[in-house]
Amino acid sequence: MINWYKTPKLVQRMFPKRVWTFPKETNAVFLTFDDGPIPNITPWVIQELKKYDAKATFFCIGENIKKHPDIFKTLISEGHSTGNHTNNHLNGWKTNVSEYVKNVILSEAEANKWNEKSKIKNPQSTITNHQSLFRPPYGKITTKQSKILQKRGCKIIMWDILSADYNTSISEEKCLQNVLKSIVPGSIIVFHDSVKAEKNLRYTLPKVLDFISKKGWDCKKISLG
């Protein structure tokens, strides 16, 4: 993970085809959760979001979808967006282009298995976002990998605020302040529904949701529409 709590504007300008923020005029913030679905953690996140009628985007690892399809199904049924986070949480800077792209496609396939079964019961069901929204693990992806995925129709979703909830060396309060000191309408915020991040996440997320609510901002999922 690239450890800027607030992504510098210069970095955002260097990669203009990647999505870093949304217009402030949306009056909304965009919470995102990487690395799930994980039992006990992802379901807890879903329940916390529901308390505020908040929607979010979950960048899922393919192997975790395979292990926990019921949780993945719940994400969709609760109205959240899902996106691709590779099949095995690959570091793009350490993976050749062919292997990286194949791993992304494997993750798509895991999501599509659920989608095809779901359509039998509900013809309107769709997880098109999962196939088209992509976040590189650690924020690390090469220019060539990026171009190939974009040609396949992927939107590469980055962020402007990193909670660093996964960092066990920082305090829960530091994690919270990483978010609160920089959040504005249009912000894309990174959390992790992972075992490693659980302690900081359970402390921080309810307080962030309360802060957003008191500001009168919406909490929206990222979608293609």
Task: Give each language-model segment a name.
Residues 33-35, 60-62, 84-86, 136-138, ...:
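A cross-domain feature marking catalytic cores of carbohydrate-active enzymes
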Residues 36-40, 60-68, 90-98, 135-142, ...:
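Acidic-and-aromatic substrate-binding clefts and catalytic sites of carbohydrate-active enzymes
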Residues 4-93, 131:
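Active-site beta->alpha N-cap acidic-glycine motif
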Residues 73, 97-104, 171-177, 202-206:
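Charged helix-capping and loop-helix junction motifs
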Residues 15-25, 51-53, 64-66, 199-225:
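C-terminal domain-boundary segment and adjacent tail
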Residues 140-180, 216-224:
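His/Asp/Glu-enriched short active-site or ligand-binding loop at hydrolase and phosphoryl-transfer sites
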Residues 46-55, 80-81, 97-143, 147-151, ...:
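CE4/NodB-like, metal-dependent polysaccharide N-deacetylase domain
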